[in-house]
Structures are given as C-alpha cells and as structure tokens.
Amino acid sequence: MELIEIFKALSNPTRLQILKGLKDPVKHFPAQDEGDVHTVGVCVSSIQEGIGLSQSTVSGYLATLQRVGLVEVRRIGQWTYYKRNEATISALAEIIGKDL
C-alpha cells in the first residue's frame, strides 16, 4: 500500500466526495437501471450526474482512485461500475490508527 499515493488521491476534494458518496450510493447518486449499487457498483454516468462534472473529468478521478486501490471497477457490457474497495479502506484506517 502506497500511503503517499493514497493521500495524494484523497487530497482532491472531488475525489474525496466521490469516495464518500460511494459509501452510501443510494443517498448520493441518482438511481440507475442496471444492478444493485451495493453489489455491482455505481455507473460512471450516475456518478457524473451526482457530482455535476463532465464524464471525462469524473472518469479521470475514478481512474486515480482505482490506481491507488480505493475503488473497484466492474465492466458489464458497455457500462463501467465503481464501488469502494472496503478492504483497502479498512487497512488504511488501521494503519492510520496504529502508525500515525
């Protein structure tokens, strides 16, 4: 786990907002037709609509969060879905609690 890279990813307010929103996606993002948001994840277009930024900007932010392991990605047909990687987030919380 690259802590510096994770903290860099979290230093952007919008990326942090996306990660927080994915914790309770029903509350923070519009409903989507395909799949349960807790199982499959949230579609990029729903995240885009909830955040209010362009799809390319949101996709870039999600790619950064994925690169550092904070979100998981799942592709179903032409759609890409994201959800939090709770294992990484729990490990990060444990490291912060013990080492910082």
Predicted regions mapped to residue ranges:
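Short, charged/polar, Gly/Pro-enriched secondary-structure boundary elements
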Residues: 88-92
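Residue-level signal for well-ordered alpha-helical positions
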Residues: 95-96
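N-terminal leader segment of winged-helix/HTH proteins
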Residues: 1-21, 62, 67-70
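Gly/Ser/Thr-rich helix-start
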Residues: 61, 78
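Beta-hairpin "wing" of winged helix-turn-helix
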Residues: 67-76, 83
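N-terminal helix-turn-helix DNA-binding core of bacterial DNA-binding proteins
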Residues: 8, 14-54, 80-87
